[in-house]
Amino acid sequence: MSTLGLLIMLLGIIIMCTLVILRSVNPIYSILNLIVIYGCYASILLTVEMEFLACIYILVNVGAIAVLFLFIVMMININIVEIQETMKKYNIYMIVGIIGVVGLLGILITNYQIRIKEEVIADFSMFLINSEVVQLQATPSYLDFYSLFVETTDIRTMGSNVIYGSYSIWFIMACIILLIGMVGVIYITEDLIIEKRTLNERRRQDINSQVLREYKITIRNYRESK
């Protein structure tokens, strides 16, 4: 598949998921479609050789949406049986997700080559020489220093030189702030759920305790009703 055809397919998936989000009432389906949209957008970034931004979109946006999905499940009373019955109607989205994953793997396979360690290559070369499979020839060998400086990836440049190098302290502080925010929201949500359950238990009517507390009045009212 050509790059243009892959981009058209990913854009079509994004447009379809956007229309589903606009028409959907259930927030869970909206979140699932958002995850598909971000995955397709990360695939588009991989096709234009922006690996670092693609990884950031997957880690930050999809991770944040997964946490939001968890909060919605915690705060909304959702029947699991209804979800399972409704998910049977959305098999097309599973097919779209599989196509997106296959496309992403195709991009990774076409853009990256498998790197073999130099020790393995050296051992294999010595095996070929000793077994006289290949004949040695006098060929000039040199080291291309230009390729060492030019042929680099976006992830290596941004990660090793910028984030984990010059701005490592700020990166660690941002991670700590995000962790505090996630833990704080989970703690507040859990307290609200426990308080709501306690309030419902208090409002529950216990007939035995009411009868024992006002036994004479209950017997009298029962006799008068007859």
Swiss-Prot record:
InterPro entries: NADH_UbQ/plastoQ_OxRdtase_su6, Nuo/plastoQ_OxRdtase_6_NuoJ
Domain of life: Eukaryota
Catalytic activity: a ubiquinone + NADH + 5 H(+)(in) = a ubiquinol + NAD(+) + 4 H(+)(out)
Pfam families noted in UniProt: Oxidored_q3 (PF00499)
Keyword Signal found: no
Membrane-spanning segments: 2-22, 28-48, 56-76, 90-110, 169-189
Principal location: mitochondrion
A GO CC annotation given for this chain: mitochondrial membrane
UniProt-annotated location(s): Mitochondrion membrane
Name by which UniProt lists this protein: NADH-ubiquinone oxidoreductase chain 6
Name of encoding gene: nad6
